């Protein structure tokens, strides 16, 4: 069997947006019949929440829409994560910039960093080299339940586009004998 395609979602502390995106994407990959070929993980650019579980408000939002709530611990992204991933999905422009700095001189790793909302067909188009902030996934941390619902809606809106991209990437991988 071929190595799995690795998707990593990244936010600030790895307790709200990125684990929610991880859950949504795992669900969509399973529905698309790709669960055995794709591994989804999540991290944060900060170590401030390291070891903490998913924010309970994120868990409530996921459960309200029928998703399972993962038992997991937040962790900070490492350079090795960027090397191992096939696709790195940043929640904001600030996250994307931080990830590209972490990738450093590894041009391939830099190219694998993509804004998650760029896969949402209703999101604004951003020209190459232009500012990406218009694609930021709203941070629900300082808000209430409605803010987590908005965030989850943004994540779901991009998920099918991510699945299509991964499916296309998998089709281009050479067959192993």
PLM regions and their residue ranges:
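Conserved active-site segments centered on acidic
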Residues: 1-85, 164-174
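Phosphate-binding/catalytic loops
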Residues: 4, 87, 93, 97-177
């Amino acid at each position: 069997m071929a190595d799995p395609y690795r998707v990593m979602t990244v936010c600030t502390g790895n307790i709200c947006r990125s684990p929610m995106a991880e859950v949504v994407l795992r669900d969509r990959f399973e529905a698309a019949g790709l669960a055995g070929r794709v591994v989804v993980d999540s991290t944060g650019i900060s170590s401030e929440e390291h070891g903490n579980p998913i924010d309970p408000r994120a868990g409530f939002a996921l459960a309200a829409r029928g998703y399972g709530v993962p038992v997991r611990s937040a962790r900070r992204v490492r350079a090795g994560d960027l090397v191992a991933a096939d696709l790195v999905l940043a929640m904001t422009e600030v996250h994307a910039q931080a990830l590209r700095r972490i990738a450093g001189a590894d041009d391939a790793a830099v190219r694998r960093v993509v804004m998650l909302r760029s896969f949402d067909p209703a999101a604004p188009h951003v020209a190459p080299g232009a500012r990406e902030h218009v694609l930021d996934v709203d941070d629900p941390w300082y808000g209430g339940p409605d803010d987590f619902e908005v965030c989850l809606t943004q994540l779901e809106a991009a998920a099918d586009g991510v699945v299509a991209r991964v499916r296309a990437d998998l089709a281009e991988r050479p067959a192993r004998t």
